[in-house]
UniProtKB/Swiss-Prot annotation:
Organism this protein belongs to: Pyrococcus abyssi (strain GE5 / Orsay)
Reactions this protein catalyses: oxaloacetate + phosphate = phosphoenolpyruvate + hydrogencarbonate
Positions of transmembrane segments: none
Domain of life: Archaea
Main function: Catalyzes the irreversible beta-carboxylation of phosphoenolpyruvate (PEP) to form oxaloacetate (OAA), a four-carbon dicarboxylic acid source for the tricarboxylic acid cycle.
GO MF term list: magnesium ion binding; phosphoenolpyruvate carboxylase activity
The family this protein is said to belong to: Belongs to the PEPCase type 2 family.
Subunit (UniProt): Homotetramer.
EC number assigned by the record: 4.1.1.31
Cofactor: Mg(2+)
NCBIfam families documented for this protein: PEPCase_arch
SUPFAM superfamilies: Phosphoenolpyruvate/pyruvate domain (SSF51621)
Name of the protein in question: Phosphoenolpyruvate carboxylase
Keywords carried by this UniProt record: Carbon dioxide fixation, Lyase, Magnesium
Amino acid sequence: MIPRIMSTQHPDNYSIPFFANSPVLGGEDEITEAFYAFNVLGADEQMWDFEGKEVDEFVVKKLLERYPSFFRKVILGKDVRLTPRVPNPTVEKAEAKLLLETLQGITRAADYARVFYGEDIAPIFEVILPMTTSLAEIERVHELYRKVVNLADERIYDTTVKEWIGEFYPKEIGIIPLFETKVALLKSAKIIGEYLERREPEYQRVFLARSDPAMNYGLISAVTYVKNALQEIWELEEETSIPIYPIVGVGGPPFRGGMRPDNVDNVLSEYPSVQTYTVQSSFKFDYPTKEVVKAVEKVKSTKRKEPYSLEVPDFITLYEVEYQRQVKILAPHIRRLATRIPDRRKRKLHIGLFGYSRNVGGLSLPRAIKFTASLYSIGVPPELLGLNALTDRQLDVVSEYYVNIYEDLEFAMRFFSFRVAEKAGLKELVERIKEFKPEIEEEYVAEAEIVFRGEGDIIKLAQMRGFLG
């Protein structure tokens, strides 16, 4: 069974998990978290994030040693999955060799599983390749893993590697490309189609980002590009008769996908053709456990349906330009606030996509969660940026395929400070939002205005809206 729920390590929570030794999760706590996601919450997959994070490479060994009774009943690699996100050497040169180490670690994890289960079971048999933009990047990882496995046949002095060190298993792995940029999302189906022609796998998984596209191009553009990709992937699946299972990376705020325990129905209706939905840290730890379990069960009880059909509207480009103009205006405030947003995971040095993006003049900004948290904390939710570039008629066109757009905008408008937006230089946005006559959470906005001035309680605001960023 292909997973419906992928637990991830995205640090968007304001609450500290009950099992954590520190507010900043890492190492041993993340081993516990993986078990908690499987055993208590009912997730059927855990992403293990080697891309820019300090994670434990002995995760399989530790899970099997610490929780043997659970993993004898629930087989790791069959009933539940552990899926690493690896660095992409094309983009992340400093972390490039970690890709090779992670691929070698897959075979080591299989050795631990063989000892534990008494048979060949691959606890890890797929990897997620972030920032994928071409067929070549996917093929390189595929070929590199093959070389790792073929090392077994090499002669070392007076013996072979296989005789000395043992077999390398599994023989093949699946590569899950993660498409994050506008260009990559728009050509994702084409890239996957080329890959399927060469490989003809039993099935293929595809990961579509929601947070970074929203940060780079705005909420409405991100939803548009992801939905366009989902439609083309569905058509490719019908054309090739090879099952293609999309994963969508969704976080708590509408800006990052709206995946909260109290909003799963909307997410399911918004992305009906998606097979696997991410549940990030806020989903897992900022809500009562009963609500979280119920929400996970709800998703797992449903099946994929046909996606919405759409053509990317021409006016989206104008919206993007205005969104990026407003981000530039807010950049000093975002950077100032980001230093006050608490860290929730141990991270290595990492440059987000915005750092590489030429269309914003190389503007250096924090990653999506702190970006979102910073803007919510001053009462300017990022969902609303660029909205003044669209007419009511254009929003109606978008609502034909982005079915929850008005609900998402209404959610964000509750936390909007007209005063802060005006002071920051977003007069046109202020005038446009007034037309919606939003119901404002006055207590929230009052605190956000204090935060904008340099004081105030950022965690209190996160609790009021239901997520950190």
